[in-house]
Amino acid sequence: MAKQFKPETLCVQAGWTPKKGEPRVLPIYQSTTFKYDTSEQMARLFDLEDSGYFYTRLQNPTNDMVAAKICALEGGTAAMLTSSGQAANFYAVFNIANCGDHVVASSSIYGGTYNLFAVTMKKMGVEFTFVSPDCTEEELAAAFRPNTKAV
């Protein structure tokens, strides 16, 4: 059985297992870009044919370690970092719902998220029904459609 670590230990140790001669703690990578020897190598990264770091806004070792720590703390299988809650909302919904799909959401969500769902994602073909957080089970059930993908 795998050893269960306390949250404090996971915060410090999860996501990084140093090899001989490597630092105990992963350094913070402050670079925006990463070096490759040829433009072909970069092209393969941009085309998602190869994996690796090439632009920090997309991925870097520091972000990967933070995601691994969050994953360990939450007991998950993977985690993804975003630059904002709005981006997290977009990714969460758009990975579940496609053009022609439907989602049920609370009517009392953050205004920017309401706008993202009611306007922007509607333009992308995802329809939303907003229900009161105090709605009954019957009212919630009535909001569902055959193409509802998420609540």
Predicted features along the sequence, with ranges:
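Short conserved active-site loop signatures built around small residues
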Residues: 1-29
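PLP-dependent aminotransferase-class I/II
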Residues: 115-151
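Conserved PLP-anchoring active-site segment centered on the Schiff-base-forming lysine
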Residues: 95-113, 132
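Short helix-loop-beta connector
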Residues: 73-77, 97-100, 145-146
